[in-house]
UniProtKB/Swiss-Prot annotation:
One of its GO terms (cellular component) is cytoplasm. It comes from the Eukaryota. This is Putative cyclin-dependent kinase inhibitor SPL2. Putative cyclin-dependent kinase (CDK) inhibitor necessary and sufficient for PHO pathway-dependent down-regulation of low-affinity phosphate transport. The keyword Ribosomal protein does not apply. It comes from Saccharomyces cerevisiae (strain ATCC 204508 / S288c) (Baker's yeast).
Amino acid sequence: MGTYTPLIYNIYNVHIWVFTESQGQIGQMSPRGKMETAVSQGQHKQLKDGHQHKGRKLSEEIASLLRLKECRRLNPASYYTPRRTSQSQSLSGSTFKEYNEYINEKDSSRAQRQNAAAVLSKLAHDFWENDCVIDEDIFEDSSDEEQS
């Protein structure tokens, strides 16, 4: 493997490494999935000299070099199976139907418990608000009342 100089340019999210003459590679993929184009030291010198004579920035020269180089981006759709457009249609008759019904039952029982807790808390608040007084009205509906 050849060595490279630490001159790295980032133009249009494309890393450009300036390699020495002994390196024969033209391009690599970076670990992050970005395309990297290797420019030989001679090409780098030509670009730099061209920059001095033409008055253009080195980054513009490298960008024009990249535009001339044929690059194509792969279409990821060809590597993945297509998804259905509506998930509600796929879940209606699926194997998860019983599980979803169980979850809905669990949620409804939770809501019932929350409602019961709210009613109990209101009754307790009313009880303490009335200075813990128990009226005879509480026992009106009781079946243990004495018959007169």
